[in-house]
Amino acid sequence: MAAAPGGSAPPAGPSPRLAFSTADSGGGMSGLNPGPAVPMKDHDAIKLFVGQIPRGLDEQDLKPLFEEFGRIYELTVLKDRLTGLHKGCAFLTYCARDSALKAQSALHEQKTLPGMNRPIQVKPAASEGRGEDRKLFVGMLGKQQGEEDVRRLFQPFGHIEECTVLRSPDGTSKGCAFVKFGSQGEAQAAIQGLHGSRTMTGASSSLVVKLADTDRERALRRMQQMAGQLGAFHPAPLPLGACGAYTTAILQHQAALLAAAQGPGLGQVAAVAAQMQHVAAFSLVAAPLLPAAANTSPGGNGPGALPGLPAPMGVNGFGSLTPQSNGQPGSDTLYNNGVSPYPAAYPSAYAPASTAFSQQPSALPQQQREGPEGCNLFIYHLPQEFGDAELIQTFLPFGAVVSAKVFVDRATNQSKCFGFVSFDNPTSAQTAIQAMNGFQIGMKRLKVQLKRPKDANRPY
């Protein structure tokens, strides 16, 4: 073997480029922490997450790779606290923000390290990258104010990364804007210093400065709006006293029920079952849809009109459920005003459908992971912030959800931005596909499709 220019042979090792010593196995996290000669990091420095690194490389081995982009403040390889084993990822903080941006631009998914099948991941850590605590919504601006005016207003509070005035299609200002600062502290300082502090020229009230809504909050709000549009139903506050809890639940789900009932293949029997299904989700199966006093005529032997409330749960000409004249004894405690409820009565032809939903289902059974064939959906392009709870809330208006799961990376505990939802019937699954496939959340559009049957690829 030829000698190296310095007169000594290179060390032998399994890797052609990066043959370094492995990290110690003391457990927890071992780090390359700043010494006395290392300057403090900038106030707007970014903490980076580095993934897809060989498990044989420690901080000293990785340092030369990242130092070419700037001075490193801290580099920490993540290790299992119990076993001390390398997790294949690390956290990296540069002294300067620009260094982090350069490293991300040059390395993220651009280079594959020896022994790895996927390119290295270099991106802001979860707590840093979303910018949810740095992006502000600014309302009650003057119509004549542009981006430069807004920048001058917020410049004293720190470094502004983005500034966008919202405009109508004709180019006129909507009187509001988004401002994104370099750090959470700068954003909070701007809120404290400017919110309600002045009234801008041409504005009707004082300046509004607050944290902008997250993608998750916007998505859930759009879902609520869409549910109302599907049913062409506009709920209004009703002074119903003891009826409030019941009618609120009915109002919230009536629009989704109407949309589902009008879908292909759902007849009147299934519509009645769907009524009970949606009411059961709010623990209303064992109780009446409305207290007897609020839905009976003065004579007590027929349904009466409730001001401001449409006939409850009527679908495609199928009438609402008719109350019986006899109430359920011993159930006065369900109401604060002591009004006894009545049991819902069904035509005998629909008894099988109602029986299927007579028991209140739990929201997510732990043992049942999938629904029947044709009821299981794959959802792609979910927002990074979405968890299981948000996924359930998004798809619950379309039917009873058997299970919902967002897939998470085991090493980083970050969402992989896809998951699955299982319904208990194919109609709900098809309705969800029609409504949600292509639905935009943030900068992405959801892709919703049926999961392939397990035996789809098996030869006959």
Curated annotation (Swiss-Prot):
Gene3D superfamilies: 3.30.70.330. Residues 319-336 have a biased composition (Polar residues). The keyword Nucleus applies. Its main location: nucleus. CDD domains: RRM1_CELF3_4_5_6, RRM2_CELF3_4_5_6, RRM3_CELF3_4_5_6. Residues 1-10 have a biased composition (Low complexity). One of its GO terms (molecular function) is RNA binding. PROSITE patterns: RRM. Keywords: Cytoplasm, mRNA processing, Nucleus, Repeat, RNA-binding. Residues 1-37, 316-336 are annotated as: Disordered. It is found in: Nucleus; Cytoplasm. Pfam families: RRM_1. One of its GO terms (cellular component) is nucleus. Residues 46-127, 134-214, 375-453 form the RRM domain. RNA-binding protein implicated in the regulation of pre-mRNA alternative splicing. Mediates exon inclusion and/or exclusion in pre-mRNA that are subject to tissue-specific and developmentally regulated alternative splicing. Specifically activates exon 5 inclusion of TNNT2 in a muscle-specific splicing enhancer (MSE)-dependent manner. Promotes also exon exclusion of INSR pre-mRNA. This is CUGBP Elav-like family member 6. It comes from Mus musculus (Mouse).
